[in-house]
Amino acid sequence: MTTWKFERPKQLPREKYITKVFSRYTLEDFVFYRNKIIEIEDEKARDFLMLALVDSAIKASWTMKDGAVVKIDKRGKPPLKKFFKYKVKRMFKDLRNANMKPVETVADIGNARELNLENETIDAVITSPPYLNKIEYTKIYSIEMSFLGFPDTRIKSHIGSRVEDVSVSEIGLDENLPLSAKVYFKDMNSALKEMYRVCKNNAKAAIVIGGGCFPDRAIESDRITAELAERIGFKTEETSLPLFTVTLTIRKES
């Protein structure tokens, strides 16, 4: 990284949602580093540095995440180069301190309702599904997703995104639920079934999920998800409720 000699990029991103939150100098630095990282042949090193770069670019931007809103603050920020070098050093330090053993890992984009996994092959699951009636995080992280090459439409096409009416009586739920809630829990039920299928006996799963708010009511997504899981065959061991987020630990029964 220290041997890279800066060259002003000939082309910069032109999307309005990007140009309005970055100075020209920050964008030039980002594109320069991105182009250099893309040239790295080692995939792990390339991904490692690209992750550090995207995180650093956001810190050097004028964006400020405030809950479900992205605000713009054009007060002076240190140059991207400073953030990037600090981030890479911090990530290297974390790797050294973690003392992780080399294991095979696989990262994939798929569908939680149709897992590409064999039956009873998983020991543990940790997941945070999309929250009911909450899609603003696709907007909050739109810049990061764009920089990493992921279209936000792929995210929105997942759990609870369909608009056609569905029946939920067969999974034991009230048909008077709002349409988006019915679609959401129908999908969640499918995801839980798949989770049950791939989990080994006595496997454990932790699900972080938040409640859903509608104009006429609040829906306890944690309670409903726990009920769906128990009907499928899981055993609810623990439920905790810090603010509006619940963690369910469920155990597959013998």
Segments (PLM) and residue ranges:
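Conserved phosphoryl-transfer catalytic core
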Residues: M1-K36, F147-I171
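Acceptor-substrate binding/catalytic loop of class I
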Residues: P13-V21, L177-K186, V208-I209, C213-R223
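SAM-dependent nucleic-acid methyltransferase catalytic core
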Residues: S23-T127, L132-E136
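Short glycine-centered segments of the SAM/dcSAM-binding site in methyltransferase folds
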Residues: F48, A203-K204
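SAM-dependent methyltransferase catalytic-core segment centered on the flexible catalytic loop
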Residues: Y131-E194
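Short alpha-helix
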Residues: S190-E194, E220-G233
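Helix-to-beta-strand junctions that scaffold the AdoMet/dcAdoMet cofactor pocket
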Residues: C199-N201
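Class I S-adenosyl-L-methionine
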Residues: L228, F234-S254
